[in-house]
């Protein structure tokens, strides 16, 4: 059986890693050993931070809802409880957008919450 030389395969693998490392600083962009480590670490950060981004946006939405709710005389938790009691099903992303972009609509929602909590 003939000997298989891996020059083409190895070159392709190295090229793939170096393309992923494009834009990195120093030897990380052009030395295969450091580039491979840097690309692996970048992948770990990317995986982790895709989860963190979801948390961060939810936190931002809650802050915006809280600000809008306090203008209407509620705390965030009172407002969310009131939405539940009133039977209003709306997610935090949309609610924060309403609070920031359309104060009149948010006031209407707050009035329904106030009525539901009073009843």
From Swiss-Prot:
Short name of any one Pfam family annotated for the protein: Ribosomal_L20
GO MF: rRNA binding; structural constituent of ribosome
One cellular component term from this protein's GO annotations in UniProt: ribonucleoprotein complex
The protein's name in its UniProt record: Large ribosomal subunit protein bL20
Gene3D superfamilies per record: 6.10.160.10, Ribosomal protein L20
HAMAP family according to UniProt: Ribosomal_bL20
Entry keyword set: Ribonucleoprotein, Ribosomal protein, RNA-binding, rRNA-binding
Any Gene Ontology biological process: translation
Family: Belongs to the bacterial ribosomal protein bL20 family.
Phylogenetic placement of the source organism: Bacteria, Pseudomonadati, Pseudomonadota, Alphaproteobacteria, Caulobacterales
Alphabetized CDD domains for the sequence: Ribosomal_L20 (cd07026)
Matches recorded under PROSITE patterns: RIBOSOMAL_L20
Purpose of the protein: Binds directly to 23S ribosomal RNA and is necessary for the in vitro assembly process of the 50S ribosomal subunit. It is not involved in the protein synthesizing functions of that subunit.
């Amino acid at each position: 059986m003939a000997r298989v030389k891996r020059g083409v395969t190895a070159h392709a693998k190295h090229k793939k890693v170096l393309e992923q490392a494009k834009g990195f600083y120093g030897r990380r962009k052009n030395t295969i050993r450091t580039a491979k480590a840097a690309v692996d670490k970048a992948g770990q950060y990317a995986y982790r931070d895709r989860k963190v981004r979801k948390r961060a946006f939810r936190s931002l939405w809650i802050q915006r809802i809280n600000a809008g709710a306090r203008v209407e005389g509620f705390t965030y938790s009172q407002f969310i409880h009131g939405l539940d009691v009133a039977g209003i099903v709306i997610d935090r992303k949309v609610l924060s957008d309403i609070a920031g972009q359309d104060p009149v609509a948010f006031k209407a929602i707050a009035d329904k919450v106030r009525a539901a909590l009073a009843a």
